[in-house]
Curated annotation (Swiss-Prot):
Homodimer; disulfide-linked. Expressed by the venom gland. Belongs to the ant venom allergen 2/4 family. CDD domains: Sol_i_2. InterPro entries: Ant_venom_allergen_Sol_i_2 (IPR020181), Ant_venon_allerg_soli_2/4_sf (IPR038211), Sol_i_2/4 (IPR055216). Keywords: Allergen, Disulfide bond, Secreted. It is found in: Secreted. This is Venom allergen 2. GO terms for cellular component: extracellular region. Gene3D superfamilies: 1.10.238.190. It comes from the Eukaryota.
């Protein structure tokens, strides 16, 4: 989805520009949990804290930013696993969202995205 990729690219750039970068964070904005959390929040992924809704909205992003069907399926599985794991513990909705985002990034989903291939 070219339009979704364009908007997400813009959101990532804006989030990377406006969020303070800590010394220990990677230079690449695509490797930063705070940048992805910010960009996904702008897309409304975390508006409703219900785990089923978060899972559905995150999963819907997979085919928008990944072109290989096998990678899309892997993305959806990772999203499901991360949402299930990170919503078990009592935390604020914001912290759960950040943890879900981090879990997805650590699983290597970003490397399969169109955005990562453009570098």
């Amino acid at each position: 989805d070219i339009e979704a990729q364009r908007v997400l690219r813009k959101d990532i750039a804006e989030c990377a520009r406006t969020l303070p970068k800590c010394v220990n964070q990677p230079d690449d904005p695509l490797a930063r949990v705070d940048v992805w959390h910010c960009a996904m929040s702008k897309r409304g992924v975390y508006d409703n804290p219900d785990p089923a809704v978060v899972k559905e909205k995150n999963s819907k992003m997979c085919p928008k930013i990944i072109t290989d069907p096998a990678d899309v399926e892997n993305c959806k599985k990772v999203v499901s696993r991360c949402v299930d794991r990170e919503t078990q513990r009592p935390r604020s909705n914001r912290q759960k969202a950040i943890n879900i985002t981090g879990c997805i990034l650590r699983a290597g989903v970003v490397e399969a995205t169109v955005l990562a291939r453009e570098k």
